[in-house]
Amino acid sequence: MIRLYIFLVICIICLSCENNNILDFTPRKTQVAIQPFGQFPNDVLKEVQAGIDSIYDIESTVLQPIDLPKQAYYRPRNRYRADSLIRHLKRIKSKEYDKILGVTTSDISTTKGGYKDFGIMGLGFRPGKSCVGSIYRVQRGTINRKHLISRFRKVTIHELGHNFGLKHCTFDSKCLMQSAKGKATTIDKADEILCENCRQQIKHVLR
């Protein structure tokens, strides 16, 4: 009788495991949320998503647009503080995502050297949970839509790389983790790749 009882319990547990996929040991990929601020071009969003998914072998999700936070606005220069946007993104990030990338068409800035408010294309802390990119400065000097998208994909991949722990690359001049030094033309010279050295550095943080 006891043996029959034990057998029935085991059967119930096995059925329960099957129904709830408890035996599914498929590794979960790193999850990244892409958060548009305000109206943002859909074609650029799709390309950004495809770019970061491909380079980092992750799964990203485009969220519904939200307004830029008022507390990040810097009235004297009519732009938004990137560090404030990053903190805001970190606060609102859902636990289901490992990182969150904010994208905007508005100008963004940060404090750099002797400049209190320095206009930038993107910002990401190393390591970090959130980063932000803007097409406002990226679009300057572009010859067509394809050129703009290529530049912005590199910017977002670069800032996300900082979140994953990467420093500016000094090993390969074609690696997109090279420092742009504030120049969009530097971004154009880089390939949309991570060099082998950078790849090895983040292998342990990506699933």
What are these model-derived regions, one by one?
Residues 2-8:
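Sec-dependent signal peptide recognition
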Residues 13-16:
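C-terminal motif of bacterial Sec signal peptides marking the signal peptidase cleavage site
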Residues 18-23:
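Bacterial lipoprotein signal-peptidase II cleavage site
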Residues 25-43:
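Fold-level signature of zinc-dependent metallopeptidase catalytic domains
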Residues 38, 117-151, 167-207:
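Metalloprotease/metallohydrolase-associated module, dominated by Zn2+-dependent proteases
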Residues 45-155, 167:
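Metzincin-family zinc-dependent endopeptidase catalytic domain
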Residues 158:
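Conserved phosphoacceptor histidine of two-component systems
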Residues 161, 165-166:
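Active-site-flanking alpha-helical
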